[in-house]
């Protein structure tokens, strides 16, 4: 039996983005100044021309992702769960959900065990925000 290597979910996410980028030139990855934390930096290293750091601006990131999807790209927008679901909720609903755009949202660091970042980064309500 093959030995299972235990790695963080976010590391698997980064690896998967790189694999998808190799298979599909329309994949583009956006993050909100969190490339190291969400592991989108792995994609950035492999495909710098298809990575967009939107800064600490999740709402804007979702709007950019919606525009890219409308233009035929396959965007993966990545942030912490609190900000991807909470801060950007209206943009996700109006700019992605209503027009049924193909935007993938990668939300890491959900729940209450996000280490030293504290209560502002903890998100238990992400499931209720996104249960549409």
Model-predicted regions and their roles:
Residues 10-14, 59-62, 89, 123:
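Short, well-ordered alpha-helical scaffold segments within catalytic/effector domains
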Residues 3-7, 82, 119:
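Hydrophobic alpha-helical scaffolding
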Residues 1-42, 46:
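Conserved acidic/glycine
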Residues 112-115:
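A short acidic, helix-capping loop that chelates divalent metal ions and anchors anionic groups
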Residues 117-128:
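Phosphate/diphosphate-binding glycine-rich loops and adjacent basic-rich segments that engage nucleotide
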Residues 35-104:
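Thiamine diphosphate
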Residues 130-132:
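Conserved small/polar residues in nucleotide/adenosyl-binding loops
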């Amino acid at each position: 039996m093959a030995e299972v290597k235990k790695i963080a979910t976010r590391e698997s996410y980064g690896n998967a983005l790189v694999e998808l980028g190799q298979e599909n030139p329309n994949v583009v990855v956006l993050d909100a100044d969190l490339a190291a934390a969400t592991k989108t930096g792995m994609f950035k290293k492999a495909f710098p021309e298809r990575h967009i750091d939107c800064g600490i601006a999740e709402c804007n990131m979702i709007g950019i992702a919606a525009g890219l999807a409308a233009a035929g790209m396959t965007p993966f927008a990545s942030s912490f769960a609190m900000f991807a679901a909470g801060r950007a909720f209206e943009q996700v609903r109006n700019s992605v959900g209503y027009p049924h755009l193909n935007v993938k949202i990668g939300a890491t660091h959900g729940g209450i065990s996000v280490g030293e970042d504290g209560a502002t980064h903890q998100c238990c309500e992400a499931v209720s925000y996104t249960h549409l």
